[in-house]
Amino acid sequence: MEFSIEIALPSGKKIRVKELKNSEYLSIIKFTENRDFKGLNDFFEALYIRPDLNIIDRIYLLLYIRMTFIEPDINITVDNKSISISVASMLDKIESSYVDLETTIEVNGIVVTLDLPCISYYETVDDLLIATIKHIQIGNESIDYNELDDEVREEVLSNLPAALFGRVTSFIQTIQDNILNCELIEENKSLGIDGVAISLMSGNMLEFISSMYRTDLQ
């Protein structure tokens, strides 16, 4: 039986994950060195990420795994001096920035529940918009969108009214208005450290995560 831990996520969900193996960590480093963020995303999804986890839960989960199975601190080298920064402090900041924005809209009798996007890598704005769709109610038919495979998702989307996507775009703006940049590493001028802030809705979020999986940063 493999060792595993249960992680409580900012949304209130819990997930049990198995220990990261050395071979898996080496694969992560290879994806990182080749800047293959799509491949890295697919790798993380196969290992750890459930389809129903939103983007903030995913950031939190991947940093928690880094803290637990690799090292609890991140070492930053400044002027030949190594400075340790706690990953736990980053997790605290992500958790404190979490806002529940789930909302329901109705267009032409179709009721759609929107929430923080269940995505950790996207190449187009359309990918981001679609990832906010959580649940669809059409008459007596109830659809959990996150549980559908890609082919069925495309079929469902093609039958939704065009007016819906204007409402989804407005919801994305609501997310951006409520979830601002999160400063994970505070500026320390006396030590020569620049502050590091990430947008929790940024398309380069996975690039940031990949850098965190290195044990030392320059």
Task: Report residues per predicted region.
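Long C-terminal interaction/binding lobes of large macromolecular proteins
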Residues: 1-218
